[in-house]
Every structure is written in structure tokens, then in C-alpha cells.
Amino acid sequence: VLSPSDKANVKATWDKIGGHAGEYGGEALERTFASFPTTKTYFPHFDLSPGSAQVKAHGKKVADALTNAVAHGDDLPMALSTLSDLHAYKLRVDPVNFKLLSHCLLVTLACHHPAEFTPAVHASLDKFFSTVSTVLTSKYR
């Protein structure tokens, strides 16, 4: 469960990211594909080469979903319900992939904002991404 300070840390970090969220989402997705090649199996129709427009566009979708989650932090199940249905019933994404992408998002944010990436912020973002992952996989049961 996210504490009030966790929510404040996540919101403050997301505010600092600002217009770069889509860029960072694409970078994190590229990093996921490079570090965990099995994640590529869900995107056979994508050009997965570095700098691919398709990867950048999907990364922006990921970032937009996270921005929505940050804005609706008090009701993540409602905010992510459509995405949860999509990933569970249509795409059938292995739940472990959410953890892999979450890790790559943390690395990407730490690379771009090292001064702001304090242990407390790191812990709050990790809890937030874990909570988002839990919500996204809740329909798998």
C-alpha cells in the first residue's frame, strides 16, 4: 500500500519528468527488450531495432498509462481496469514482464534524474510500479 509520502514522492517525480514521460517510456521499453529478449515475443509485428518509431510509440502509451495512474493514485483498479482486461484477456502477457519493465523504468528514471533519485524516491517508485503491476495482473486470477 502506498503511503501518503510515497504518493507525494511519485507525484513530485512525475511532475519533474513532465514532457519527457513518453521519451522515457520508449527508452525503458528498449532497455527491457535488450535486457530481457523473451519480452520481444509479444511484439512480433514491431520493428524492435534501437530507435524504432513503433517502440517509441508504445513506450509513450506505457508512459501515458502511468501518468493516468499517478493522477488516480487513490483508485488504481478503476484507472487501470481497461488495460488490465486487455493484458489479461486479449494479449495474455506473462505477469513477470510487468516486473521486468518496472525495473527498466526505475533504471531509466535514475539515469535521467540521478540527483532526485534518492533512496526514498526509489522506494516509493518501486512500490508504485509494483502496485500498478499487481493491478494489471489482478484479472489473471
From Swiss-Prot:
Query: What name is this protein filed under?
Result: Hemoglobin subunit alpha
Q: What does this protein do?
A: Involved in oxygen transport from the lung to the various peripheral tissues.
Q: Where is it expressed, tissue-wise?
A: Red blood cells.
The record, for Pfam families, names:
Globin
Keyword Iron in annotation = yes
UniProt: O2 binding residues? H58
The UniProt similarity line reads: Belongs to the globin family.
Location of Phosphoserine modifications: S3, S35, S49, S102, S124, S138
Q: Which residues bind heme b?
A: H87
Which organism is this entry from? Answer: Mellivora capensis (Ratel)
